[in-house]
Structure formats: structure tokens, C-alpha cells
């Protein structure tokens, strides 16, 4: 069964088919954060026309994250074509919560950023996103439990960090 992320944004809905077979750790992280409501109310803090829209920063500046980092799965056979969901990072193995969706093919990012999904509906919405637009929610459809269970030890570790940060 496919795993779909439904983004509800100010501009409308975006549906992305996730690729747990190609990026299991990245998908487990994204699904876990989405199910916890981490992305709800965050903005697209960086929008570059004819390149990409970026979101997932709790500070809204591009400097925030979930409080942990994890390794790349960038050499998974998925390339940066138009409409892919990929992890933003600050260098090798610095993935957290920030992601981007491409407007155009960006092959120079291949091997440097982990592609983990593809827009299947709402590319017109992606193309219309403006900086500061809100991600109202991200909901997961499909066997989210299996995606998280595949990396249960890491998800448990991440959730300890997220829970500690929520109490701080």
C-alpha cells in the first residue's frame, strides 16, 4: 500500500507519495513528525522561484529543527526532478525536520540531499506558494505504522528528544 502525505496549506492541498523503500529512515522521521503535529502551523520560510519551496523550521527562519540530526539516504536512486520532496540540510548527515519541494529539476542536489517523495497532486499549489504561507497540517495516509516500526529504535530515540524539548 502506498504512503501519502497530505499537506493542507494556505494555498490548497498538496499530496505527496512517500518512498519508504528508498529512504526508510527519512520517511520514518517525516511520518513521525507529521503524526506528532510537528509541522502544523509552520510556514514555508524559504521560497525561491523556479527552484523550490522550503518548510519544516519551527523557528520560521531556516535555523531550527527537531533537536536531533540524522544521516543522509541521498544515494537511493531517486533524483531531484520537478515535484520531489527532499530533505534540507546544512551539510552531510544534518537532516532534521526541514524539507523542500522542487519547482524544477535540480540535479546538482543529487547525492547531497535525500529525496523521499514525489508530488502526485497539487503541483499547481506548490508553484503558487509564497514565502510565509502556512502549512496548516500534514496528515499521513497508508501504513504509517509500518514506516515508523521499520526504524522503531531511532523513532523512540527521536521522540525522547522531542518530548524533552516540549517540556523545556
Where are the predicted features?
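Cyclophilin-like peptidyl-prolyl cis-trans isomerases
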Residues: 1-168
Amino acid at each position: 500500500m502506498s504512503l501519502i502525505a497530505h499537506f493542507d496549506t494556505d494555498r490548497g492541498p498538496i499530496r505527496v507519495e512517500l518512498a519508504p523503500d528508498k529512504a526508510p529512515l527519512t520517511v520514518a522521521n517525516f511520518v513521525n513528525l507529521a503524526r506528532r503535529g510537528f509541522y502544523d502551523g509552520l510556514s514555508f520560510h524559504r521560497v525561491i522561484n523556479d527552484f523550490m519551496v522550503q518548510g519544516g523550521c519551527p523557528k520560521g527562519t531556516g535555523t531550527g529543527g527537531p533537536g536531533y540530526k540524522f544521516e543522509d539516504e541521498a544515494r537511493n536512486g531517486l533524483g531531484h526532478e520537478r515535484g520531489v520532496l527532499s530533505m534540507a540540510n546544512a551539510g552531510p548527515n544534518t537532516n532534521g525536520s526541514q524539507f523542500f519541494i522542487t519547482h524544477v529539476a535540480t540535479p546538482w542536489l543529487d547525492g547531497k540531499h535525500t529525496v523521499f517523495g514525489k508530488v502526485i497532486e497539487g503541483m499547481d499549489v506548490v508553484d503558487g506558494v509564497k514565502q510565509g504561507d502556512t502549512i496548516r497540517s500534514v496528515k499521513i495516509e497508508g501504513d504509517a505504522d509500518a514506516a515508523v516500526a521499520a526504524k522503531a529504535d531511532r523513532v523512540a530515540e527521536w521522540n525522547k528528544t522531542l518530548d524533552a524539548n516540549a517540556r523545556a
